[in-house]
Amino acid sequence: VVTLPLMAAAAQEPSLQDLGDALTPPATAVIYTAKEIVTLDPAQPTAQAVAVQGSRILATGSLEQVRTHLGRRPYRLDATFADQVIVPGLIAQHDHPLLAGLTMTSEIIAIEDWVLPQGTARAAHNRSEYLQRLKEANDRLKDPHALLLTWGYHQYFHGQLKKADLDAISSTRPIIVWHRSAHEVYLNTAAERKYGVSRGWFDSLPESPRKQSDFANAHYWEQGLFAVLPKIGTAIASPERIQAGLQFVRDYYHANGVTLGAEPGG
């Protein structure tokens, strides 16, 4: 997502786009005029015109300013929105794009249906349905040592989850169950072994994360989760998973009208 302020800053220096424009005849730009255009730029919070070429915003400002910016580039005027207000799509201030990307591209076994571009992940309504779905997900993976990362479990619907439950699914494949809240994880023995989650490591932790962990069942929440993340983080957020996740988020957000998303700081 490219916001108007960033485009304004980028316009101050030559770019590859500018070089391409110099080598090939530029496509016709469109100048949209409106009653008001909200820009999200503190230096210019509103405008009356915006120039667009393809999917790129070229300039905002008054009609005269936009025309001046385009120079000799061909353009046409479009007054479709002359009596309307243009805003930058749906602004989602607290939607965790990175978290969404990592969870939505994992094996989704949740308490409700998730209708996604790659298909619909049906709800698991109780413990038996959840464990059966987890077994099926394990069986679909041909490599017995490949990670099974799943998101959506919730104890209020699926019952308490023990390490023995996950070990019964696979004794060779690392399994990481990411709680629906994203604040908790559960591991099986193979995951502990692969990622170095040992008794010695656990005993070396400060008191607070140890109190928010159940080592016997490989269950870590809140500060316990932050303690174990350095061990499992490269598996959950590998470069391949991050890339696939962010591509999913981009397409999913745009398809639903979200043009600006934010990962809140903490």
Question: Could you say what each language-model-derived stretch is?
Answer:
Residues 1-7:
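Bacterial N-terminal signal peptides
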Residues 8-12:
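Short, low-complexity disordered leader/linker segments with a strong preference
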Residues 14-34, 38, 42-266:
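Divalent metal-binding segments
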